Amino acid sequence: YNNNNKNNNNNDDGNINYQNTNEFKDNKKNMNFKNQYNNNYKFDENMNNSNTMHSRNSNVEEHLRNNSIDMNNSNINNYTNQQTRFSSFMENENENENKNYHTGGMNNNIHFKNKYDNNNSSMKNTDNNKTDTSYNMKGTINNDNNNMDYLRNINNINEYKGSAKNKFYTNYMNKNNLKFTQNNNDNMNINEDNNNNNNNNNNNNGVFSNYQNNNMNRNNSINIKRNLNNNNNINNNMNKMGSQDKNQNSNNNFYMNYNYQNRKNSMNNNMNNNMNNNMNHNMNNNMNHNMNNNMNHNMNNNMNHNMNNNMNNINSLDSDMSPNYHAHVKMSMMNYNNNESNTANPNQMNFEQTNNDNMKRENNNMNNYGYDDNTVHVNNNTPSTDFFSRAVGYNNNYLNNNNNMNSAVNNNSSNGNNMKNENSENKNVADNNDSLNNNKNNNNNINMNESINNNNTLNNNNEYNNQNNNEDEDDDDWGELGEDKYIDINSIMKKKNVILNQLEADLNDLSKKGNDGKNKKKNKMKKDDLFVLPHTN
């Protein structure tokens, strides 16, 4: 120690001035003790501390009585004129070696009894250079037994104060815990904001289009994932604080363990609250609002059947989950069952299934989470009313409900495919009928034209015969057109094919001519490029 080092550690016990002690040690050459029982004491007059014991063998209590200083009413933060100081210079008789010893630091709250023998001339559990004795420590010096006994007066010692090592560690812990606590508070605020955003999105569901509602639902799921991530950050912070407490080597164990237990309880409460919020928001959002948007106008008989199964699952949920959950969901489910619809949104259901998987994985992580060496796992000795046990049950019911909805989606998809196939077949039949009708019309036109051409050479005799046959038209088995006017479909189809082939040939010829013209134009352009003069300045 030197005068430049005041040994100020910025702790709660104030700044301790060691100047007098250092001056005393600097003048130790003038102390000519032949052994530790010698009463000769040479006091340095330069030491201005009026509360210094002038005799090594003086009794502490007697010294305090002779010095009229009220220790209990003094200012604890200023020890300059109130501390009882003495330092001794003793000679080890066996080793002929001089040793400097002291009684311990100020406000040292450790019970100790210091003995000196031939093999150990320094005190244990104290720093070897301090020479301060606390004003609130009383004791006696027993020369016969060659020891010094001190009894601690704990009435004037604050439990938050310890040795310098303990106070330094406590300050270090407080600073680090403050950092982790602030981080946890930030995470909790973010969780609250995310939950508020989810509530706002849920309140707006049904107002916008399905596309906008799906986007809001995705945002809700992202917020829930962020909440779970924040919970993991809280766990990590709590583990760091817990590991620091476990590794501490402090004598102030009661204070440290008390705070550690409080942080454990706080972590339990935070995790329970966050998991409750996440579970409730996830289930309310995904089951109620997504089903309302995606299925309210898109459910069929298969979906109604599955929704009835979901009603049974909902009735089995724990009533402790949410106060307003049952009535709201049940009424919504009843309304859904009364609506007519076709299909659910498969993409949205797949997206929600991913959320279910994430929540299931989070619950597994919570089952395996441990706070300390005495970890209480959900599957071991946790009571049945424990939150995490209920959360696993909620999640399983939720997954079962969504599995039913997914199966309904699959049924709807298959039904939709069947309907598409039927529609395509019907469309093909309709197209075939249209083509047949067109062919009939074309054939009729062709037949009529042929009839007109064939009848151009009719003479008066044919007209006369037709007039004579008018009386027998009612008995004609072939109808009003007569036998020669009957439509021959096979001949018409052959003629149609001939016409189509001719049209195809004409189109091919036109295409060929068009391509030839384009090629000639390209070749001409390339040829013209050969004669383009380069640009010159």
UniProtKB/Swiss-Prot annotation:
UniProt region (Disordered), positions on chain: 1-22, 187-254, 336-372, 399-479, 509-528
Keywords: Malaria
Protein name as annotated: Asparagine-rich protein
Biased composition (Acidic residues): 470-479
Biased segments, Basic and acidic residues type: 509-518
Keyword Zinc: no
Coiled coil residues, start to end: none
Biased composition (Low complexity): 336-347, 399-469
